[in-house]
Amino acid sequence: MPKKILGLPNRWRVRIATFLTLTLLSPAGVLTSTSAWAANPLAPPSLKTVAIPEPPDLANFVRDKTVAIQLGKALFWDMQLGGDGVQACASCHFHAGADSRKRNQMGPGLLAGDTTFDKGGPNYTLKAQDFPFHQRQAPVDRQSSPVVANTNDIVSSQGVRLTQFTGVNSGSRIDEGTLLQDPVFQVSGTTIRRVEPRNTPTAINAVFFLHNFWDGRANRIFNGQNPFGPVDNQARIFVNNNGLLQQVPLRLDFSSLASQAVGPPLSNFEMSFQGRTWPEVGRKMLSLRPLGRQMVHPEDTVLGPLTLRTQALGSRVSGLPGLNATYAQLIQQAFQPQYWNSSQGITLGALQTLGPTSNNPRSFAQHLGPAWASDPKKGPLGAGQYTQMEANFSFFFGLAVQLYEATLVADDSRFDRFQEGRIELTAQEKRGLDIFLVQGRCIQCHGGPVLSNATVNLLLVEGIVERMAMIVGEAFYDVGFYNVADTLTSDDIGRGGNTPFGEPKIPLSYSKLGLDKRDGTLPAYLIPYVPDLPCAAPCTLRRLDIDGAFKTPGLRNVELTGPYFHNGGMATLMQVVEFYVRGGNFPQANVDNLNPFIAEIGFLQGNLSGKQDLVAFLLTLTDERVKQEMAPFDHPQLFVPNGQDAGQPGMPDQMLEIPAVGAGGRPAAGLPPLQTFLGLDPFQP
């Protein structure tokens, strides 16, 4: 345990007191259940007790939520969205909401400024022996054991090849562009698919987070255009006000999933040729049949009513690909008419490229400044003009995808049922739960029913910035974002990074924004969105604990979402447990920003059965519907790149088919359940 307790947030002091009391009163410091069917009163309740966050003024924008969800699911899974006609949102979120591919999934430490691979190289095929990335001599669960290997390489998801965007052609799924020489992601001079600089988190249960992405840059407030919420005070959507087309700022709260959704489709790492903007994405998608190259299962819980005469026989779906409605029709049915019904052409402002920044190698393009609307009587669109529906496509896309992802709630695991008093856990699983709550200290960061402190239901009660006792001294930090020393702070500063807006660049962290607010240097337009620091005047504390901090992920379905951490550097749950038991990888190097609960766990050192108990508990967090892709986790057919064929000219993609499944999931299709990353045993060190 850390030496300092008196300056910790109240909720942590209460948890420490509970830990001490129960350790003293329980035999050997292990909790015991008093009833075979009793829920554990110290554990979080079932996730079914948590309301799904939603914008309070949603009805002002959406007139048919059911159709909006259909639109969102179609867009999320549609491969035509990518600049290459291949990359869908789902391309990186098809396996329990995450990514299980193993070839061309590695990148160098780009966020540390490193462009050199330590392991494998581009198009490498991952193997079990590559993990963990940070290795110690035995015993690996002790901080004193020497380091024998370490790399700042990452495992993430392959995206697009580096390509300069030049235009879209109506009816074509592939954008026009010029393939560029990629200095990093190339094999013998051939540009291959780039790999994202951070591991892919799961989209399942993401609706419960106040902010999304590992660094939280997907703002809780959706501005209709990009991930950065009110930080971009120039972002606008177009509203038809009684025949007058106006640019209006959008500030839609509890919408970090919408903010997140509009980022990747313009990212020159993930889905886009660089220089593409949202109106051009809109023009392209509105000219295409939704899911036009993918089969949709007739029993799909959301899209089934829109399928084109399809039939399912086992894992095969026959008939015609796509849907029987257009994207324009779905938008018109889903959204209030003032956001799409103008006949005026829109001339947008100057094109601006944002990024890369010192902490983010990605870039994206958007139009800046005021736009001009043409006289509707002048007929067809002029050169360079867009329709209102095209110009607002980012708004439709973000909100529709958010509403679809809000249906991806995994709240029926064995742990949920146990906490509801409906089933029993095994003795081993209950011992693991006790370790999770007490000796392991896991609950300190993985709190609440989502098993993360970064969620809406916790942060709205406890506050988004707290004052915390560090190993030495005190600091302000963003609740739910922690430096746990899995990588060096200098390898990726995470929450300590900046947005691409402002000079100097506006920070991501509420702690830093709060300090700027106190100092009087915060831009005036951001003041309403930044809470005061929790420090009564006169307050001289200026220290921030934000560098190297990342959003605490939820743990549900963690069996299926490896590799783990923001760098993807651990392949099994046992490797994760051993990391925490030894007190992290770099506790001394990261001491200035280290979460004070990251310390050696003596109870588990050399205690294999205790570690196995903890892993066994983590496996109770799997929702069987996720594992079997049963409703609401069913989906259309998808083809994902799984590396490039080095034996062919130009190194074409090797494609992996993800078959369409309906409400009955994989069992109804005769498919096996989803597997762990690389098929590894979760108990394997």
What are the functions of these language-model segments?
Residues 39-234, 413-571, 575-579, 586-589, ...:
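Short glycine/threonine-rich turn/loop motifs
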Residues 40, 129-372, 384-406, 569, ...:
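Periplasmic c-type cytochrome electron-transfer domains
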Residues 271-274, 589-593:
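Short glycine-rich, low-complexity/disordered patches
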